[in-house]
């Protein structure tokens, strides 16, 4: 049985482990329920599941990464993880152009979800840095794809949830860095209005910016948060640190299987209080490791188990600038419900890219974890969905596990354009997933 | 596909005019529900029931279904999947209670009731299970009865059909292990419904709504068997082991 990272709505599929040589055959022998490729299973909902059909897991080859130091271009196998990419690139003075909050995603998954990071307001999402893809099509042919060669298919694939074909290899532009450290400014902010104002004013001066919001705080503390902003450190800034390009993240702990739900109002409240209090009121120029700044949760293996057998949802949406009232309404509503787990993440997006299903667009994006077993969750989510959609916002498919086909149609007005491009690439409807069935993505 | 809150997209009630079946459909319907399909013998009654059903934004449909026409069942399930997509929850809610006195006077009528309650359920249950296995997900909810747990002389024809159904459903559930699909066997006690209208309530009587609430909870928890109310499990654990002479003299109808 397969689930996403949220451990909800399991379904059974024929899981086939393949390498590049056996991929085409495994896909061709899929039955009426179609096929899908799965990476590291970090999308939260049912995006990497295919109930009753074939799910292909592509093996990552041993020499899967080539860095061209004259151009800064990286060509890597789609099954290569960001963990492997960073271990290869950072000591050589390069960084991935965009990283999500975990390094345990594959390159293929990053393209399928068009992932974004703390630098979206400056650099856009991962697809903006992609130069070419090698893709297995539904008819068995392998095509070399660039934005120029087939813009329709290119942008349908970026953020296309793996439903246009199997990306086997991709080339992207890496970011030159001097060190493996980040220089970070931290500010503790007491309420929501101050947070939005501070972010709107100062974000442009930083490559990376994100705020962690305590969604259990209410009243005058509503939206109290810790804002961290920074950039890669230069060699000068890390003078005195040993080996400026050293990079070797380690696992610190693991959550064992079968733990009961540890997330309740008391535990979350205590955690958030501790976390808010321990943050400095204002700290400038702190040197942090890449792992601490970008991937703090990756040190704890299987942290998704702390929600017990019901699992959890990660609710992420974006509303355009100007819809701050809706954003505040959502935050207030979640705070009132008391269901939010740990700190939520608020981030300002820059403009989106041409991908019809690519999630980011200019505006505010908020991410909040909610235990799936919480009472009244269905009503809460419906209320939040209405607020988001009425404000012209939308939901992130890589996170979604609850919303409806109507919500997606409203949030992604170019869905039919994507469906046409997809249909051209796969008229026989080979590529399919549980999320595609649930949200009626394939027209 | 059901979502992370276990809200089904498509619900099918076999025996679509059954009070318990309708209550389960209403209780399971959420914001994500697209279709509620009532499969019943009498389409007109089903249409009226569909109109009265509170299922939010979901669309109610009525299709013809005859439990005793076992040859039609596989085709019916195929049609349902063709028309409504993956079947997330199928509720097997049909059944006839009949009258023990009538059955004893008319053995052919008894056989007809048993055919509907048991053979019909076997045939459509297998057809549904095949579909769910193909899908790799889905739940079949089977309305059994405590009447089948230890059969009473006052309604042993009905009770024996439910005993058979209960055993069949348990075996079917076991056969689906590892397929992604599963079976929930529901054993209600005496339920105040149109099936029991005019009869005196038995002790620990319950309502269709209470059965529905218990079913929703059990599906979320991934249970395989439930009793409604739950205390009946203990009561029947005792009843099952009473010596025959005592059981025959029990003052229960």
Where in this protein do the model-derived segments appear?
Chain B
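Conserved mid-core segment of classical short-chain dehydrogenase/reductases
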Residues: 74, 96-111, 154
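Conserved glycine-rich cofactor-binding loop
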Residues: 17-19
